[in-house]
Amino acid sequence: MPSFDIVSEVDLQEARNAVDNASREVESRFDFRGVEATFELNDANKTIKVLSESDFQVNQLLDILRAKLLKRGIEGTSLDVPEDIVHSGKTWFVEAKLKQGIESAVQKKIVKMIKDSKLKVQAQIQGEEIRVTGKSRDDLQSVMALVRGGDLGQPFQFKNFRD
């Protein structure tokens, strides 16, 4: 029986490249001359720390980072940015988290969405991913379109497509 897995992963190497590109752009921009403005990628926590001298500049840096992530093939919805910007001394910073894996609430929404579609497929939650099996390849492709079309707040990839 044909099957595939629905996962949500961020390629850390591409994220590192995007952070490096964003840092290079900030160094060359006129409005950031003489200003302490940095990006720091933490591989262990899968977070990106955006630091600057004002909250307005932190928001500008986040826009630059989102643009660079998008150019590297990482969707902006995979970056979880908290609402509040932390003020510490003379700097402002925000710690944005890269979404890895699918949370259980989102997994349940996806499975419910698939079951409500009345397609002849089965969806099983397996840890951080969802395995979808069905008799017809067309049904599986319909499920892929359904998941892509659903507004679930994070990007999904489809792996291990077996016929």
Swiss-Prot record:
GO terms for molecular function: nucleotide binding. GO terms for cellular component: cytosol. CDD domains: YajQ_like. InterPro entries: DUF520, UPF0234-like_C, UPF0234_N, YajQ-like_sf. Keywords: Nucleotide-binding. Nucleotide-binding protein. Belongs to the YajQ family. This is Nucleotide-binding protein KPN78578_03700. It comes from Klebsiella pneumoniae subsp. pneumoniae (strain ATCC 700721 / MGH 78578). The lineage of its organism: Bacteria, Pseudomonadati, Pseudomonadota, Gammaproteobacteria, Enterobacterales.
